[in-house]
Amino acid sequence: DAVGLPDYQMGDSDNGHRTIGLGKITPTLYAHIIGQIESKEFFSNSILEEVFTKAVREKRNINIMGLCSAGGIHADNRYFLALIDMAARFDLTSAGVQVNLWPILDGRDVMTRVPYQNGIYYLRQLEERIIERGLFNVVRIAGTSGRQFGMDRDAINREDEAANIDRALA
C-alpha cells in the first residue's frame, strides 16, 4: 500500500523506485486502471469508446495486444476481460467488426504467486468471457506468445527469439 498498490498486490523494485523520496503515496497505473474497472468508470473512457465507435462506423477490425496475467505489476488479466465486456456494449456483429485479442502470457511474475495457474488458465478465462457475452463470432484469440520471448529486458540478447515474435505478430 505504501508504494501505491492495492493491499492485496505484492510490490517489486519498480514500484519502490518510482516512489522513493516522494513523501506521499501515489497510486500506480495498475491501481488506477483496476480501480476504474471495479467502479465501472473504465467503461465510459472516451478514448476506448471512440475506438469501438470508429471501428463500427468505418467497419474496421480492432486488434488488442498486451500482457495477460495475474502478476499485477506489469498487467492484469482483468484488463482483457474488461475490454471484452466493453466490446459487448457495441453492435460489432452488424458492422462485421472482428476484435482480435493478442494476449502475451506471463509465467515469470505469476508462477511465484499462483503456481496452479498457467497460460492456459488465462486463455480459458478469456474464452469463457467471450462465450458469456455472446461474442464468439466477433471476438477471438488471434494469437499469443510468452513474455520471455517478446518483452523481457534481455530479449535484445536473444534476437532470434524476438524476431520469431515479430514475424508471428506481423
List PLM regions with ranges.
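Acidic/histidine-rich
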Residues: 170
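Active-site nucleophile/metal-coordination loop of metallo-enzymes that catalyze phosphate/sulfate
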Residues: 1-155, 163, 167
